[in-house]
Amino acid sequence: MKLAELSKEEIQELSMVEVAYLVMKETKEPFNYQDLLKKVAELKGMSEEQMLDRIGYLYTDLNIDGRFVTLGDNRWGLRSWYPLEQVEEEITGPTKKKAKAKAEEEVDELDENIEVFDDEFEDLEDELDELAESEDSDEEDEEFDEGDDIDELDDEFEESDDDL
């Protein structure tokens, strides 16, 4: 089926995605989405307002319909034109090294902050351990001095046992 063979009424009855398919099939070249939308709207005799109202519908239909493939940069083509490997290659664009480098710098900065935090945390732990050890040794010193006579303490315990 060719667009030239169809009457205005038949084109009106076709969906936008069907008209887009016929346009691409006849021209045999990929389209920028905006250009494709304008061409479809022109063929269907749509007003500017109608076209803007349906802009998202055509885009959604192109994504869902297995006959179309996005080529990147908002360009669309027919899947039948491209072998699978070529489509994957075209879709994969050049990597942006600046953004990646900036992201790596941010990660490095975060790693440094974590290391500083870990060091501060370890220092705080060490201080708390030392403080706890010194308090423990102070309590032990108060409980029993070597000068205390063990016999006196035994006598005190025996007296308290007798009271029970």
From Swiss-Prot:
Q: Which domain of life is it from?
A: Bacteria
What family does this belong to?
A: Belongs to the RpoE family.
The name this protein carries in UniProt is Probable DNA-directed RNA polymerase subunit delta
Q: What does this protein do?
A: Participates in both the initiation and recycling phases of transcription. In the presence of the delta subunit, RNAP displays an increased specificity of transcription, a decreased affinity for nucleic acids, and an increased efficiency of RNA synthesis because of enhanced recycling.
Which gene is this protein's source?
rpoE
Q: Which GO terms describe its molecular function?
A: DNA-directed RNA polymerase activity
Residue ranges of the HTH HARE-type domain? 14-81
Summarize subunit and interaction data from the UniProt record for this chain: RNAP is composed of a core of 2 alpha, a beta and a beta' subunits. The core is associated with a delta subunit and one of several sigma factors.
Compositional bias segments (type: Acidic residues)? 105-164
- Name a biological process GO annotation: DNA-templated transcription
Q: Which UniProt keywords apply?
A: DNA-directed RNA polymerase, Nucleotidyltransferase, Transcription, Transferase
Identify the Gene3D superfamilies for this entry.
Answer: RNA polymerase, subunit delta, N-terminal domain
- In this record, what's one Pfam family? HARE-HTH
Recorded hits in InterPro entries, A to Z, give:
Asxl_HARE-HTH, RNAP_delta_N_dom_sf, RpoE
Q: Which GO terms describe its cellular component?
A: DNA-directed RNA polymerase complex
| Keyword Nucleotidyltransferase set for record | yes
Spell out the residue ranges making up region: Disordered. Answer: 93-164
Presence of keyword Nucleotidyltransferase:
yes
